[in-house]
């Protein structure tokens, strides 16, 4: 079951490969995610020093958060992957046009995981084509319903 989805990722990118990564989170962040207070639409993934980080995701702290902790909602969060997966991703990202995008946050065994995708950006005409296909599928379904 997904906690947060990045629906815009499928519109803006051609998804090549998907990976499931663990997240290094603080306690207040897990509580906030359980309450559904997160957003990954603006997020992106970068590689620094053979480590992978999630930048730009927003997790709003709950008002009941501890008074001695000053939460930063947009802090950089480390992603946990196997070394071989990281090496493979570094090789792919260094190729022209490839990037890493967060797709969703979900639970697995009580832990919060992040699906990331190796993706290639869509051009404007690709986005228009996707929109036309989606519109045609809706029209086709509407015509089929009207015919029966």
UniProtKB/Swiss-Prot annotation:
Gene Ontology BP terms: trans-translation
CDD domains: SmpB
Cited HAMAP family: SmpB
MF annotations from Gene Ontology: RNA binding
Keywords: Cytoplasm, RNA-binding
Protein name: SsrA-binding protein
Function comment: Required for rescue of stalled ribosomes mediated by trans-translation. Binds to transfer-messenger RNA (tmRNA), required for stable association of tmRNA with ribosomes. tmRNA and SmpB together mimic tRNA shape, replacing the anticodon stem-loop with SmpB. tmRNA is encoded by the ssrA gene; the 2 termini fold to resemble tRNA(Ala) and it encodes a 'tag peptide', a short internal open reading frame. During trans-translation Ala-aminoacylated tmRNA acts like a tRNA, entering the A-site of stalled ribosomes, displacing the stalled mRNA.
Main location: cytoplasm
Protein species of origin: Burkholderia ambifaria (strain ATCC BAA-244 / DSM 16087 / CCUG 44356 / LMG 19182 / AMMD)
């Amino acid at each position: 079951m997904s906690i947060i989805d990045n629906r815009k990722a499928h519109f803006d990118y051609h998804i090549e490969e998907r990976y499931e990564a663990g997240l290094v989170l603080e306690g207040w962040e897990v509580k906030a995610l359980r309450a559904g207070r997160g957003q990954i639409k603006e997020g992106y993934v970068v590689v620094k020093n053979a480590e992978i980080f999630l930048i730009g995701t927003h997790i709003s702290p709950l008002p009941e958060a501890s008074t001695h902790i000053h939460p930063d909602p947009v802090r950089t969060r480390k992603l946990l992957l196997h070394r071989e997966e990281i090496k493979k991703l570094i090789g792919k990202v260094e190729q022209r046009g490839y990037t890493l995008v967060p797709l969703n946050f979900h639970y697995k065994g009580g832990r919060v995981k992040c699906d990331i995708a190796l993706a290639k950006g869509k051009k404007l005409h690709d986005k228009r084509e996707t929109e036309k296909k989606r519109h045609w599928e809706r029209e086709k379904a509407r015509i089929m319903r009207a015919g029966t």
